[in-house]
Amino acid sequence: MEMTEMTGVSLKRGALVVEDNDSGVPVEETKKQKLSECSLTKGQDGLQNDFLSISEDVPRPPDTVSTGKGGKNSEAQLEDEEEEEEDGLSEECEEEESESFADMMKHGLTEADVGITKFVSSHQGFSGILKERYSDFVVHEIGKDGRISHLNDLSIPVDEEDPSEDIFTVLTAEEKQRLEELQLFKNKETSVAIEVIEDTKEKRTIIHQAIKSLFPGLETKTEDREGKKYIVAYHAAGKKALANPRKHSWPKSRGSYCHFVLYKENKDTMDAINVLSKYLRVKPNIFSYMGTKDKRAITVQEIAVLKITAQRLAHLNKCLMNFKLGNFSYQKNPLKLGELQGNHFTVVLRNITGTDDQVQQAMNSLKEIGFINYYGMQRFGTTAVPTYQVGRAILQNSWTEVMDLILKPRSGAEKGYLVKCREEWAKTKDPTAALRKLPVKRCVEGQLLRGLSKYGMKNIVSAFGIIPRNNRLMYIHSYQSYVWNNMVSKRIEDYGLKPVPGDLVLKGATATYIEEDDVNNYSIHDVVMPLPGFDVIYPKHKIQEAYREMLTADNLDIDNMRHKIRDYSLSGAYRKIIIRPQNVSWEVVAYDDPKIPLFNTDVDNLEGKTPPVFASEGKYRALKMDFSLPPSTYATMAIREVLKMDTSIKNQTQLNTTWLR
């Protein structure tokens, strides 16, 4: 087993920013068609609610084994502006981002900047195009039962309580408007009466079901008025119904959570949840999931939602682009972060240059030895200010530096509205003025500026606290990951790929030292390294001193990782240094058209599409890889080991100046 240094072989990458649109229909026309088709659903579902804040460009923390006031008018104005926001970036902003992305990446990070410097295999590296199309990267979640999630059933579970499809068309737009105003207590009416034109029991039943399903919290009754039949809607529980409308209309015999498989293309999990929330008119926090999935990929994962019927969810399949919902079931419990067993990846590397022998050696090494379990580049952000630098400033209690790192102008091109916001901040130090430059205020910069407007420049800690907790913790987790990557590289450089006395292994969740007399009982796959914290132990060899020196250089005390603000105290965790993927398989295929898909997705299979057939020879060659990884493990680091090169976008941009043309 040999360990090799980084080589300078080029990794080409496709146009990451440009979305594929193979339908032949202009994107805008398709969007209008979909929105028109779905306007009925958007206007009739439940409550109008604020959405939870979502932060852009902050990497999410992987799971590890753990050890242990400004003016009122200004704040009101800011909140009013937020209410006017829609799905995020305007089309103008999206175009601006696309045009400037390559320039922005030139000022980003390389792998060496974050401690990623070693390989475990000795094969010769080769190049390939990663994610030329987002459909070349498919992620299937592995559930807590060990099964790989697939979308293969769009049917709705049989339930006598479920209303028919007619509930979506039986009410007029005016009736829906009146019912929504009643539901939300927007006027003084205590009831709404709807005349039954076709007085049949079936028609009355559908109207009853439509009101109860589409306007949770309302009850109905039938009344005779002057010889005519009316369905009368009213609040059975007063304003309590508004607080939890689903509580008053959900059958007791049915599990409270509808579980479903979400298939999505080119959208991350939180963005997808926000879209579903908007169409259903509910808060995002009624959804639960076991893990977040990245944007530029096709991903399949299980989601649970509180007291939303499978029928309402299935109706969204008619409305949403790049989403598909299916495999519905009712369960008693939600899903919890970290419950998944891992993810299964199907990855296509196009236009590979490696010979069949090189590919064989690379994939055999991945299968038999594995790869260094580095935290991937997405852990550290994509701009000129890495997230670990912000995390380090938080741990140092340097709050002015935290504010400056997030808000100051930075080198390299950036989204146009952010450039204007940063320039305004640098010029005026006025958070309200800078915030006005942001059309999207739910990014980290917008949230911090809101906090500064509310709490003032002398209370940066409280202002920073406006950012959602998980996103704040991303910064310090990024710093921990930065330290871990550097220390693992040094551990492998000093001791190679065999366990040595003083290394750490886990027994359950507890770390213990490898002693001289039992070193032969372990392999490198058992060895773990700590993320720095107050509740971990460090290797009992010279890597312990390397940890101490690195933290001391950053003005941090390795013996005192508790912070005066409890949220930012680091307990630490342990992480395996080498990961061996499971279910590894691969094939090299020949193809001529770089735009054709090289395998079927779940949706392709549902639609009955024939799997692609490959000729024995073609203009290009591609490597199709399948493998499963445990949670918090980065597939890009496995791909890096196969190709033997720097996977950072900065390096790819510098070595491939035409990759975005």
From Swiss-Prot:
Location of the active site: 294 (nucleophile)
Keywords: Acetylation, Disease variant, Dwarfism, Intellectual disability, Isomerase, mRNA processing, mRNA splicing, Nucleus, Phosphoprotein, tRNA processing
Stretches assigned to coiled coil: none
Enzyme Commission (EC) number: 5.4.99.-
Modified residues (Phosphothreonine): 610
Residue ranges of every copy of the TRUD domain listed in the record: 370-580
The UniProt record lists the keyword Nucleus: yes
Compartment(s): Nucleus
Stated role: Pseudouridylate synthase that catalyzes pseudouridylation of RNAs. Acts as a regulator of protein synthesis in embryonic stem cells by mediating pseudouridylation of RNA fragments derived from tRNAs (tRFs): pseudouridylated tRFs inhibit translation by targeting the translation initiation complex. Also catalyzes pseudouridylation of mRNAs: mediates pseudouridylation of mRNAs with the consensus sequence 5'-UGUAG-3'. Acts as a regulator of pre-mRNA splicing by mediating pseudouridylation of pre-mRNAs at locations associated with alternatively spliced regions.
Assembly, per entry: Interacts with SIRT1.
Disease linked to the protein: Intellectual developmental disorder with abnormal behavior, microcephaly, and short stature: An autosomal recessive disorder characterized by intellectual disability, developmental delay with poor or absent speech, short stature, progressive microcephaly, hyperactivity and aggressive behavior. Some patients manifest sensorineural hearing loss.
Name of protein: Pseudouridylate synthase 7 homolog
Source organism: Homo sapiens (Human)
